[in-house]
Amino acid sequence: MNNKEHIKSVILALLVLMSVVLTYMVWNFSPDIANVDNTDSKKSETKPLTTPMTAKMDTTITPFQIIHSKNDHPEGTIATVSNVNKLTKPLKNKEVKSVEHVRRDHNLMIPDLSSDFTLFDFTYDLPLSTYLGQVLNMNAKVPNHFNFNRLVIDHDADDNIVLYAISKDRHDYVKLTTTTKNDHFLDAFAIVKKDMQPYTDIITNKDTIDRTTHVFAPSKPEKLKTYRMVFNTISVEKMNAILFDDSTIVRSSKSGVTTYNNNTGVANYNDKNEKYHYKNLSEDEASSSKMEETIPGTFDFINGHGGFLNEDFRLFSTNNQSGELTYQRFLNGYPTFNKEGANQIQVTWGEKGVFDYRRSLLRTDVVLNSEDNKSLPKLESVRSSLANNSDINFEKVTNIAIGYEMQDNPDHNHIEVQINSELVPRWYVEYDGEWYVYNDGRLE
């Protein structure tokens, strides 16, 4: 019995000693948090792609060309940032004295329009309320959800400027009588007019018969230089840090495509074409097609993390069904085109934030002038070839414009150190809602 009692006493003493040791360890435990991500500190340390909020709405939501017509003799110029600013400045912060909405069942006619007017030509349609409020800072009660893609500026009507916003289908327009004095606008126009060259107006279908609905393009384009654009690559880690709310990211890679995801979103990165595609899982129910919300929303979202890269990105297309907006890189006032989408930012808005975000991770490092001038065919040659091509329905041609083709990895003078593209001036045609390069009578 004595041995048993002795053993019990030893065991009890050991248990008491272990309890004391464990209690001391618990009270003095200090966790190692060196390798634990703190979401709040991570967000505060997240760096933007470039300096945020440097892009301006009035240089991002712009026309692609400016047309002047006097007595049915058109002339025009590309919509450089400088030209657009000069012509919109007299219109900004003015009042709208009257608004009138007119609907035409057949071809559009504007009987009150004078024979001397200027036209802003857009490649996309957008809400009139957005353009007036966000770009011109005009307060006007206009028809709900009225979209337009041409703005006619009548500077020969009485003493004040009259605006006509024309719908994309060419059957509606909204007339706005402003407090802008004609003389103020004409002073600015006189400077822009120096850059204008002869343009030709083309009728492609029954909706482009009126003088404000023609397809306009330069009659005989001037020789344009070719360029080489050298790029830097934006790191995927920087994009992930901006878009993902927490640090838990699972990576998987297959066939050159790497997938990153957590409980808030999923992103795919293709290292062959440097394309990045992010989808917000908290906004996956439905996208928003309300352009009054999506245009300012997507602009602020991209601008907020420096996503426009301090380059000339402009809104280029809007999809009223899916809600997707495409911002496109411009060079010297001309749009650039690339089959891989290396020149685009595509974004769709949800109920509260970004729903879908696709972009190239290429940032322009330097643009080199090749000193080579390229001649383009005359517009009449382009028009005639398209009209006589049996594979093309000429009635579906809605725009003809000059742009720069970004040709990846050209055979000559290839710079091996950095990704680069050669930019070559070409004719482009908007056909059935899509843009194609014109090549010897064909659309490619």
Language model segments and positions:
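Exposed beta-strand-loop-beta-strand "reactive/processing" segments of non-cytosolic proteins
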Residues: 237-276, 308-354, 358-360, 402-435
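Extended, non-globular interaction scaffolds
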Residues: 423, 441-444
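Short, Lys/Arg-rich N-terminal segment immediately upstream of the first membrane anchor
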Residues: 1-7
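Hydrophobic membrane-insertion alpha-helices, especially the h-region
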Residues: 8-26
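Short, non-transmembrane alpha-helical segments in secretory-pathway proteins
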Residues: 83, 95, 283-322, 369-415
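Short helix-loop boundary/capping segments
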Residues: 352-377
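Preferential activation on post-signal-peptide N-terminal prodomains/segments
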Residues: 24-290
